[in-house]
């Protein structure tokens, strides 16, 4: 059995989703490829946790798993922050269960969260399993499929450089005295942003993205961590100057950022101006997919 699973980029709702607010997440066209192999070798903590969750449901594939996440790495083999662990969890769950149904999602979510010691919203696992652009709450919870784009806007994903550990940023931000104020502002903006995206209001969506990025920056400042790094700030300013908007994609501190521009052809110009690399990625409408093997 062979499967492939997309990566993810968080579009809106960082931090606030941990407190019950909606988030928006996109599956992206970097795909993990997994296959069954006869012998079980050394497994990552995520795969081990998924195996434990799968075995609790009954018979599973007893052999090994091989999961290739090379598409989630940069030219220097650095991880890009595109959700390789979530994609690996979904791939492992499908291979162990021998199917692609909803039980696979539940096993992947349980295993991924166990490997993270109970942390994480689960929206990355949701995107990996379902594909497309989604509005979703803390998982398991409501999920709404949204259009892959707003007419007149182009999504670009930029690599910001080395990242900080997500859990350390979340811990620092939650410890900030102003956490409750900021998380309420982020929650309000996330809800308004989902509504703007749903109604395909490009101008309102861009305004919400800019405001969300500023609020993330304010939270990071109060918490003493660079949620918005200097490269990300350059991108946010540059995108706005081009008539668009940008923000960190995830907890911040590096990894990737998302930007929307009215003109797709200006993405290379923006990348050159801000000194960052636009990744060759797009929204992937397909989530978990069973692939044909040469021997089949």
What are these regions (language model features)?
Residues 28, 79-101:
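DPxDG-like acidic metal-binding loop motif
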Residues 82-86, 246-251:
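Short glycine/threonine-rich catalytic loop with a Thr-x-Gly-x-Asp
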Residues 254-256:
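Glycine-rich active-site/cofactor-binding loop and its immediate structural neighborhood
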Residues 2-12, 16-18, 25, 33-60, ...:
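C-terminal nucleotide
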